Design a protein with these regions (language model features):
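C-terminal beta-signal and terminal closure region of outer-membrane beta-barrel proteins
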Residues: 183-209
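Composition- and surface-driven signal marking solvent-exposed, interaction-prone regions
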Residues: 76-79, 98-100, 160-165, 180-184, ...
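Transmembrane beta-strand segments of outer-membrane beta-barrel domains in Gram-negative
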Residues: 1-93, 171-178
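Membrane-embedded beta-strand positions of outer-membrane beta-barrel proteins
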Residues: 1, 42-44, 61-63, 101-103, ...
Length: 209
């Protein structure tokens, strides 16, 4: 990250307008104009899903331990642990009612991370966590996220039996902040919503919506 434009920051105002970005980087000694985090990781995957785009059943687990030493280019040495788990249940065995569970945890194990590279909502692999909040709404040294999703078949044609469906979801996010004395689960932020899905590829199970 580089060329930050912190529009709400005004240290010359009376009183000064200090943002979380500025205060955090000042406290931990990070550059206010750019951030770098370079490292190596150890990864493991377990995947029994019958489809990656729209699974009817199966489980997925992912683990990544990342080490970010200064000698590789990181501003400060640190290490992080990223855990992901997904599970899918076909309630009636006809693919018309699916319940999906998704959870992940992103933890700072050692050292400190630049503000923009802290565990944050919406920065998962597909940028889908913490719907309907904007990306990066929640941020902290450690973060845990959980979501339940119900997928319902609505209409099908002879050409595409899974043409139209709906989805309802509910999620929770919690983050820690050492400098503000906030531990995990002190605050739990909730999100929920409904949506319509239109199937554009029966074979690949690709949906829009």
């Amino acid at each position: 990250f580089s060329d930050f434009n912190d529009q709400l920051l005004d240290i010359n105002a009376t009183p000064p307008s200090i943002t979380s970005f500025y205060a955090y980087n000042e406290k931990y000694g990070f550059n206010q104009d750019k951030s770098s985090l370079v490292g190596v990781s150890l990864n493991g995957i377990y995947d029994t899903r019958d489809n990656q785009n729209n699974p009817y059943k199966g489980r997925y687990a992912y683990l990544s331990y990342k080490m970010n030493p200064e000698f590789l280019g990181s501003e400060k040495s640190s290490s992080t642990l990223w855990l992901v788990y997904r599970d899918y249940i076909d309630i009636k065995k006809d693919h018309h009612d699916i319940i999906g569970f998704w959870g992940w945890g992103n933890f700072t194990i050692t050292g400190d991370l630049p503000y923009m590279l802290l565990p944050s909502s919406g920065y998962d692999q597909f940028a889908k966590s913490a719907r309907p909040y904007p990306q990066g709404r929640f941020r902290g040294q450690n973060m845990i996220y959980g979501e339940t999703e119900y997928r319902k078949h609505l209409y099908g044609s002879k050409k595409n039996p899974d043409l139209l469906g709906m989805v309802a979801f509910f999620n929770v996010t919690t983050a820690s902040s050492v400098e503000n004395n906030i531990n995990l689960f002190k605050y739990i932020n909730k999100g929920y919503g409904l949506g319509i899905r239109y199937n554009i590829s029966k074979k690949a199970r690709t949906n829009l919506g």
